[in-house]
UniProtKB/Swiss-Prot annotation:
Record key words, sorted: Cell membrane, Golgi apparatus, Membrane, Repeat, Sugar transport, Transmembrane, Transmembrane helix, Transport
Membrane topology: Multi-pass membrane protein
Lineage: Eukaryota, Metazoa, Chordata, Craniata, Vertebrata
Segments forming domain MtN3/slv: 5-90, 124-204
Stretches that traverse the bilayer: 3-23, 38-58, 63-83, 98-118, 125-145, 156-176, 189-209
Family recorded in the similarity comment: Belongs to the SWEET sugar transporter family.
Gene Ontology CC entries for this record: Golgi membrane; membrane; plasma membrane
Localization per Swiss-Prot or TrEMBL: Golgi apparatus membrane; Cell membrane
Name listed for the protein in its UniProt record: Sugar transporter SWEET1
Length: 219
């Protein structure tokens, strides 16, 4: 097994492991018959991210990207369907889901019908997916600032931080090995935000085991 194959396996293992953290929320919803205290938007944005990268993987013919995002999109769809079943705010949830579907339709028309197949199509899709992934990695920064203000790490999940670090590192190295900056660059912020979390755990006290807060998505 060469280094690229090793990185591919690492990307699959760590990323799928991260996606399965949503199973905790799934079990919680089934046990309580309620979607209270479970965030819906992360499921939706991660699904959108997965589908975007799945399309990118199909255009590029990258089996690792395709496999990971098929699993990711499937799991997010299960989480979304479960949330829709148990939530009391069905109108809001259906509206947000419909908005996501609309965005997907517009994106598909643009990337499939407006842009001619080729390098420009792949580059624009890669750039779009990269920007979306970076925004997802940077979105928890407001929470980190709040943690620094309150000096409490109770809202952080150490296991999810570890998973994010290894997942981001694997994809960064994988993209670097392929020379694909659309894969490498958007995963770099995940490394830095994970290091910030590790520092906060060290600075503000011992690691507090808790149920992972399902927030992030990876390609």
């Amino acid at each position: 097994m060469d280094f690229l194959q090793l990185l591919s396996c690492a990307c699959i293992i760590f990323t799928v492991g991260m996606f399965t953290t949503g199973l905790t929320d799934l079990k919680k919803m089934k046990a309580t018959q309620s979607a209270d205290n479970v965030q819906f938007l992360p499921f939706l944005t991660t699904c959108l991210n997965n589908l975007g990268w799945l399309y990118y993987g199909l255009l590029k013919g990258d089996g690792t990207v395709i496999f990971v995002n098929i699993i990711g999109a499937f799991l997010q769809t299960v989480y979304i369907a479960t949330y829709c079943h148990y939530t009391k705010e069905k109108r809001r949830v259906y509206t947000q889901t419909l908005l996501m579907v609309s965005v997907l339709c517009v994106a598909w028309v643009y990337f499939s019908l407006v842009i001619s197949p080729g390098e420009a199509q792949l580059s624009q899709l890669g750039l779009t997916c990269s920007v979306f992934t970076i925004s997802m990695y940077l979105s928890p920064l407001a929470d980190l600032l709040d943690i620094m203000r309150t000096k409490s790490v109770e809202r952080l999940s150490f296991s999810l931080t570890v998973a994010t670090f290894f997942t981001s590192t694997s994809w960064t190295l994988y993209g670097l090995q392929l020379g694909d900056y659309y894969i490498m660059v958007p995963n770099t912020p995940g490394i830095f935000t994970s290091l910030i979390r590790f520092f906060l755990f060290w600075w503000f006290g011992a690691v507090i085991p808790q149920i992972p807060s399902y927030k992030l998505i990876q390609i």
